[in-house]
Amino acid sequence: MNTKLNDFKKKIKNKKVAVLGIGISHTPLISYLYRLGADITAFDKADEVKLKSTLEQFKGMDIKYSLGEGYLDNLKGFDILFRTPGMRYDIPEILAAKEEGTEVTSEMEVFFELCPAEIFAVTGSDGKTTTTTLIYNMLKEQGYKCWLGGNIGIPLLSKIEEIKDTDKVVLELSSFQLHTMTKSPNVAVVTNVSPNHLDVHKSMEEYVSAKKNIFRYQSAEDRLVLNFDNDITREFAGEAKGDVVYFSRKTVLEKGAMLKDDMLVFRDGETETEIAKASDIVIPGVHNVENFLAATAAVIDCVDRDVIRKVATTFTGVEHRIELVREINGVKFYNDSIASSPTRTIAGLNSFKDKVILIAGGYDKKIPYDALGPVIAEKVKCLVLIGQTAPKIEKVLRDETERSGKGSDIPIKKCTSLEEAVKVAYRFASVGDVVILSPASASFDMFKNFEERGNRFKEIVNSIEA
């Protein structure tokens, strides 16, 4: 019996509960808390018209709403407040509620308190979703009952009564979710850390500190998987309480998952096990080799080597990640909409042997783009720019040309929409070319999220007449 869950049910019944944000994760949360007998008020900055289809799901439930402009004005008198991950924990309204005695938490924080199963969790600036999905697939292929959640999969708190202590839970966690966490998973994976989300985090130091919460509360029995090739994550080992296992594409390790020639290998002291050939991995790019190494290090104690090998050679990737959309008259179109940072776009560009036509630009997260300039100069034959960050990306290429003389012959096309960008890219392309949407920027200046951006790109490409 899950006594913690029973205690939570008693605690929540008849309590005044505020849920901030009526998004994908909070829709099932609201329904679940209502079933437990909570007195719920749901808050959202969107108005009733924009939320119409979502609110219809709560028809027949006695739920109160505070919507639109000034929606947080009445955040008073609540026992418990569930914060959406994208909202900072220290805004004045939340601080005032805490001062009044309201318990402030989040869906993920409560889930960690109640979950009876072993938790594998992944964070990092890039590669989170692919690595999380790989771990999930490896565990599932081994025969475990698995649950996939966090940033992907389903909101798991509403499923907590179905999760058994013999199951495995696999989570993708962002810095926003981790920021206020006071529990860590049994197995924590940090794929890499580079500047990101500095439009929300007050500094790089705050961003890194949030990431550290994935292992900060571990015990000696837990495992921390770190990228040895990343300067920031390598240093995390000094603060770890549990068993540290590295992965590396560039270095031979005493203990960990590594690439030796073309072979993915796991070494533990004198024992070395060959897992799979890197050339057999279906999805392209050296960054995906790193993702496989990270996943291998996470599951090596509970998944057979042949199972890991099978997943390595059959996994075809995740949508919006160097996803081949279509080939038209010898021109291949790839959707890499997930690339919301320069490091992610660099990895995407390095996945191709020949120069590509790059569509880039979008919402400005206030992060540096300097590292992107040399890679564009080396790997791009035409640069098509859209969105707020277009001037930044153009500048780093021009700076690189001034510094090294490279990239001076790359045409730069500025467009006002994704539709125009695709048309311009296709007009420039010839047989054998690759056109890739890899924005190096978030999507919020034009789209709700990277999925909507990627889906729109696919719609545009699929509407082109051959």
Curated annotation (Swiss-Prot):
* Pathway(s) served: Cell wall biogenesis; peptidoglycan biosynthesis
Presence of keyword Membrane:
no
Name of this protein? UDP-N-acetylmuramoylalanine--D-glutamate ligase
Q: Name one Pfam family in it.
A: MurD-like_N
**EC number(s) per entry:** 6.3.2.9
Q: Which PANTHER family match?
A: UDP-N-ACETYLMURAMOYLALANINE--D-GLUTAMATE LIGASE (PTHR43692:SF1)
Family statement drawn from the similarity comment of this UniProt entry: Belongs to the MurCDEF family.
UniProt entry tagged with the keyword ATP-binding: yes
